[in-house]
Amino acid sequence: ATTLQKPETVARAMYRAAGQLSSPGRGSYPATRAAEETDLQCRTLAAKLFGVTDPARVVFTSCATHGLNIAVHSLVKPGATVLLSGYEHNAVTRPLASIADVRLRVVRAPLFCPNLFLEELERRLTPEVDVVICTHVSNVFGYVLPVEEVAALCRRRQVPLIVDASQSAGVLPVRMEDWGAAFVAMPGHKGLYGPQGTGLLLCQAGGEPLIAGGTGSLSRQPEMPDFLPDRLEAGTHNVPGVAGLLEGLRFLRRRGIHSLFCHEAALVRQAAEGLAQLPRVQVYSAGGKGCQSGVLSFRVAGRDPGWVAEELGQRGIAVRAGLHCAPLAHATGGTEAT
């Protein structure tokens, strides 16, 4: 679900940036020009990797949660009806809870059954729905939702779509313009191999800024600029973070998204098969259905998950126990009681 181990080039780039780069858009001397070039290279490479024609529509954020908050508050107004895929993280559900009188609909379909999911989604996507929010890959189960088909349905019904690509960016193809999504949010520190505190928001058009402030552009104007990326990027950039993220994206381009996914999928199959041989262990696996990424959940009957995680941690095995900040996913997957 995250990448603790980074390419060495990421740390080196961050160290260089901390000592050699200034703030982009805040001058014309070499250090700020170099920061501007780093920003541009990062946006341009991200745009190529994720199907965005104009790099200006790649917005830097502090994390996927930041980007999802922008997306939600840009599209969801008080009293709106929102259709959720059922696997949303609190980064989606809590912003929705902060908006008055929002009506939520949730797709309920069995785990790892994309065809049934699509049938239920289509049934619930009635004319009353104002926005659809779809998690591309569940951070709890690794379930790969059929986002291409979801996007096609949203285009036909002319309903704006927000995609949470937190677990899929860098792991599966993300094609923002092909999908026609209004927003696609992703963190830098997971499949993009960048540092914590970085993220990207891919925007079809503008959005509503969460914070206002200096951008280095239109400084006489009291309002935020109406063009991207400045409209959504108030304040000083995380320049070392962007430099590290750029190197993470370069690593991803060199290795190839498909090749990294195949490696992760092989490891997941191996882990699932091994765990399934152990007594009292229930594994939540897609088997051979091909709709699971590099995230695997399991439970040990009669044992508290926190105790299991502690025991494994003492043996050098890193796992996470609990709700994973996604109680809705547990409710949809039928694992709330575990």
Where are these regions (language model features)?
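Pyridoxal 5′-phosphate
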Residues: 1-338
